[in-house]
A protein has these predicted regions:
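Bacterial N-terminal signal peptides that target proteins for export
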Residues: 2-14
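Predominantly soluble domains enriched in secretory-pathway, periplasmic, or organellar proteins
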Residues: 5, 17-21, 25-367
Length: 367
């Protein structure tokens, strides 16, 4: 072979190799030196009512924010309020089922009656409500494979399953533990945090049969849960013991329950998301450690078993729940800019500040 032909072949093979690396869906890229993550927008909303979860519907470009008795609906692009659904009680979270044009929101008509409210995604009108059969009806997810809504009843230590098509309760299960976040793996399983047990449970999405219970140690209080479905890794955000203790982010192999790595985070985390398009993991924490500001800890999955810190984005105190727009790669948090100090007592030596709902806002983090 002539030198010219050899060099030409070598160059061509090099190009093919580079293309294979760039376009392989399983390739992991190192975390960038300068991440560029920052608070790129705040949306002042004010208003009344407490809050828990925030939900982004990236296809409809809407943000859903339940606030005690009503749901504020925002246009994601403009930040304007496009709807405000009234007439509910003690609301927590929203899940959307676009193929049925339905939104589901967890609430409690009373302390003894957990409720799943249903609304029309187009008209933003309430259409139905269902008794959960338990108390403290809290977090929820919609699984498009089973077409079911999986509802966690926190203090009720139970699960309620609602068929999104029929709006009927089609299953239930006792956890004998306090459930927090859940995620569907797209292969027939649901994974769920059991906060007071320091465990993650895996159960069958159709039969509700428990498959496994895995220890989350060194995490003792798992509350946030996200998943890299391609590489079968669970990202578990955990609170520390006590209100002033920092937490930890744990990475677990979903197939065998082994904790492969962990990283410290700040105080009072209450959610986590994984961006499959970038490999970034976000853990929003109520308290950065100074008692005045919050922080969102951002990591990057360099490999399935290795994460590296990317950025600490300071936010307002109390911003601890989060939702991802996978199309823009931006995340959204909620909280109040003003939080009034509360005097300590013998029973509560480290009380949380009292949020001022008139300073309620949405925080958008991105690049």
């Amino acid at each position: 072979m002539s030198l010219r032909r050899f060099l030409g072949l070598w160059c061509w093979l090099t190009v093919l190799a580079i293309c294979g690396v760039l376009f392989s869906p399983r390739v992991f890229l190192a975390a960038p030196q300068n991440s560029g993550f920052r608070v790129i927008r705040t949306i002042p909303l004010g208003g009344t009512g407490e809050w828990d979860y925030v939900t982004v519907d990236s296809d409809a470009k809407r943000i859903y924010i339940p606030r005690s008795t009503h749901i504020m609906v925002l246009d994601e692009d403009s930040g304007k309020v496009v709807g405000d659904l009234q007439g509910m009680n003690e609301l927590h979270g929203v899940a959307v089922a676009p193929e049925f044009n339905r939104g589901f929101v967890t609430g409690n008509k009373s302390e003894k009656e957990g409720t799943v409210y249903i609304f029309d995604l187009k008209t933003l009108k309430l259409t139905n409500s269902i008794k959960s059969g338990s108390i403290d009806t809290d977090s929820l997810i919609y699984d498009p494979d089973t077409k079911h809504v999986f509802v966690n009843n926190g203090d009720g230590a139970s699960l309620t399953v609602v068929d999104a098509a029929t709006e009927k309760v089609v299953g239930s299960m006792k956890y004998n533990a306090n459930p927090e976040a859940a995620v569907a793996d797209g292969k027939g399983s649901i994974f769920n945090d059991l906060e007071d047990k320091g465990q993650v449970m895996e159960y069958d999405a159709k039969t509700l049969m428990v498959k496994h219970k895995y220890s989350t140690a060194p995490c003792t209080n798992p509350v946030g849960l996200a998943m890299d479905k391609t590489n079968r890794r669970l990202y578990i955000a955990c609170r520390g013991k006590g209100r002033t203790a920092p937490g930890v982010l744990v990475v677990m192999n979903a197939d065998d329950g082994k904790v492969v790595t962990s990283a410290p985070i700040a105080i009072g985390v209450d959610g986590t998301v994984f961006d499959p398009g970038t490999g970034d993991i976000f853990a929003p924490c109520r308290d950065s450690g100074d008692g005045k500001t919050g922080v969102t800890k951002i990591f990057h999955a360099d490999t399935p078993d290795k994460i590296s810190p990317v950025a600490d984005v300071k936010t307002i105190y109390g911003a601890r729940t989060i939702s991802l727009d996978p199309k823009t790669h931006h995340v959204f948090l909620i909280g109040t800019e003003k939080n009034d100090p509360v005097a300590p007592t013998a029973k509560e030596p480290h009380p949380r500040p009292e949020p001022d709902p008139t300073t309620f806002q949405v925080i958008e983090i991105g690049k």
